[in-house]
Amino acid sequence: MRSYSRRSEPRPQPLRCALLVALVAAAPALAQASSVTQWNAIASTAPVAPFFGGPPQQARVNAMVQIAVHDALNSIQPRYESYDILPGAAADANPDAAVAAATYSVLHGLIDPKPDSPAKTAALDAINNAYAAALADIPDGNGEVHGIAAGAAAANAILARRANDGSATPNLPYAAPVAIGVYQPTPVMNTDPQAYIVPANEGWGLMQPFVMRSPSQFRFAPGKLFDIKGQAYTRDYNEVKAKGDALVRGAMPDSEESDIARFWPGGGANWNRVLREILAAPANNPQLDLDLDLWQQARLFALANMAESDAAIAVFDTKYTYRFWRPITAIRWQDDGNPATAPDANWWSFMATPPYPDYLCGLTNASGAHTEVLRRYFRTDDIAWGFTFNAPSVPLPAPLLPLPAKSITRSFVSLDEATAEAVDARVFGGMHFREGCTKGVTQGEQAGRFVFQHALRPLR
């Protein structure tokens, strides 16, 4: 396991002026994006992605989209193993039409015709408008028609394969004793003190993986922090209590620790963007061959998103196997039997605590999955990236006013540096104990490694 050190102070941040300027300036380069990266952006960002649910639901959708894109291109010119067996496409099939039709067809196939809602309308408008624009740029004729057919065939194959994968029942009735160390439903800030969020996604740990052999293949052993009176728990408890306190962070809204907590959204929401940014700005990584064609890009995105989705299944399997409590419950507990932990009944996490158990962390799990695929694809950890994230407003305990939305820029010179910061983010956000975060990275890496080794391999 990699070592993610505990930091009592924010890590020194060299200015790296030239790198930072280059990374931030890279965003406009997305105008040069390919059909693969353009459609990935549509599927993995608002308003489309949030319509499908939280991070694990979005990961499943992204995996299905990218598999269809990969298989559609592979049916035109076979270069890698296909995920689903498809008939060969016509030789003149237009690749860009295939990519557009594959994405469009998967997304439409996953959206129920009813009921209507503003979110659904916004998602469909984004998908339909992008599809119309994509086809308008492709010459009319047999090539376009055959490309659309290839994309639709790949989409239909993955939709059929995942029709009964268990995703329809993400939530199960939650029952657990009210006891020390056991996850309790997450309270809601600034509402009725008895208001709680119903625990979510227990059923996700039972879902059919894309590549892993079973949901429990990479289940982790119990953590050291499960010993509530032990040194590991005491250390993690006191760290998150001090660093992740909403009042502490709210009093230092522009500190690096507060920025780190806000920069990293739920699950792997930013990692598709990271990959697009890396491909769009080759000058930031001159040591890498980033001149990937559509087939190579499609394979890379498919591997990364299958890894993230399988890692999410593994993490929810682990979470609900152990049902370890969150800091928001642990710190408010009147007496946990550990004389070295002092309770605080009024403590709130800086970032909203999600409604599922602590161990392991979903963000770091997704980060480990994506970075392991990137590490193996490019055969190096030294991959630089960075961008500006528009962090939303953060509510604080009453009577304090919420922190306003803020643009936060972060940059990294390696994948390991990024995953280490993802670990810190969940501690500084008050959402997780550190051990669950560090092991989340490792579990994600295990899933990413397995996917890379067993799926979409080059044809010999």
Listing of model-derived features with the role each one plays in the protein:
Residues 8-12, 26, 137, 393:
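Selective for proline/serine-rich intrinsically disordered segments
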Residues 32-460:
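Acidic/polar surface patches and capping/hinge elements
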Residues 2-18:
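Bacterial N-terminal signal peptides that target proteins for export
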